[in-house]
Amino acid sequence: MVGRTKDYFSKQSKAYQQFRPSYPQALFDFFESLLPDGAIIWDCAAGSGQASVHYSDKVACVIATDQSDKQLAHAPAHPRVRYAQSMAEVTPFPDHSVDMVTVAQALHWFDFDAFFPEARRVVRPGGVVAAWTYSFLDVTRALGTEIDAAIRSFYYDVIGPHWPPERRFVDERYTTIPFPLAPIEAPQISIEVSWDLDGVMGYLATWSSVQRYKDAGFDDPLPEFRRMLEAVWPSEEVLGPVHWPLALKIGRT
């Protein structure tokens, strides 16, 4: 029996929608170059729609699913996006009914042995499956090595023991996830944002390990960490670019 994909984000779904970075338009332009006009996309584990709403009208419809109704409740309305609650590994979709399956920052939570057969069933022959992740934010250009070292210490030393085991796939940039599809070469793409301290702290609040730290009975670690960052934060109110290189796995069925 297929189990539910682990849900580490419903409790912070509002912060997730507000502070998780958006993906660059270059990513969606690349995807559209692989698709026919009038394509249908299944955006699986869509969260609050971070990757669902950025396609041109070349794409007729995006069906954005997530097992968390709390996440979907914060997704933005869009005329070509239909939101629905569904697991990743078992869906109500007809056979060969979509042209592409996308998974943004979520594949590592899935039951791989169940998801990939379901994706093959749902996507049309020769269709595309794409999954991508971003791991540790690079702040050295914007904020310098001192703040980078502080965030890394928070990541590994303070909340490190509370990361779910699947997080290792992200740190390994998806290189150790089996991907049983004919690979497509992808360009190098990075997320870039300009953030103030509130933006950085809001993003950290969306981490699954922060929620698990609190669920384990510890006090919220973020207020103390914020005070430490405030002591070394540059005088400029907004700094950038903060960036994350994307690791993209993409292939055809």
Feature-to-residue mapping (PLM):
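Class I S-adenosylmethionine-dependent transferase superfamily signal
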Residues: F31, Y55, A119
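Conserved catalytic/acceptor-binding region of the Class I
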Residues: R120, R124-V193
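Conserved class I S-adenosyl-L-methionine
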Residues: M1-D37, Q50
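A short acidic, Gly/Pro-enriched loop at the edge of an enzyme's catalytic core
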Residues: E89-M100
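Conserved Class I S-adenosyl-L-methionine
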Residues: V170-T253
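A short beta-strand submotif of the Rossmann-like class I SAM-dependent methyltransferase core
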Residues: V103-A104, F112
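A short, conserved alpha-helix within the catalytic core of class I
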Residues: F110-E118
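Class I SAM-dependent methyltransferase SAM/SAH-binding core
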Residues: W42, S48-V90
